[in-house]
C-alpha cells in the first residue's frame, strides 16, 4: 500500500470518528429522579442486564437494595459464613477491605508477603471492581501488588465487590484511566473459569475460580 493511500484511509477513519463523537455528545433529557447512563439505560436496567449476562456464564450477581457500607459488609460476611470459607484472602484495596470487615479475623488470611504456596491454601478471594460491564457481565479489577495479582486466579472461589455507580453499559464507558506512572494491571473477569476439551466437555475452575459472585452495593 502506498503512503498516499494509507494517508487517505487514515483521514477517512478520523473523519468517521469525529462524526461519531459529535453524535455521542447529543444529550437526551433525563427523567427526574432516575439515574441514567450514557446509553440511556437506568442503573436498574444495567444491573439486571449485568446479572443476566453473568448468570449465563455460570456466575452470580447479588444486587443490594439497602445502601451503606454496613449492608455490603454484612452481605459479604453472610456469603463467607454460608459457604464456610475459612481462609479468605482480601485484596489490599480500601473498598475490598471495608467490605470484609464483618468476616471473623480467624477466617482471614494475611496477604502481605504471602507465597504462592500460601495463597493456594486460600479458599476464597475478595477483590474490588473498578468497573462492571453490563453487556458482557464482566468485572474490571485493578491489581497492583504481586500477591493481589494472584487473587483472581488461585482461590477456588472469588467474591467481587462493587458499587452500583461502577456499572457501565459497555467497555467504552468503563473507567480505564491509567496514569503514566500507574503500576499494576487490569484484569477482566467474566464468570468462573471455564475450560473445554476437544469433546466440548466443560470444566469449571481449571484456570481460575470455579465459583464467582459479584456483590453490588447500593448508592
Give the role of each language-model region:
Residues 1-219:
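The feature marks the mature, well-folded catalytic cores of soluble enzymes
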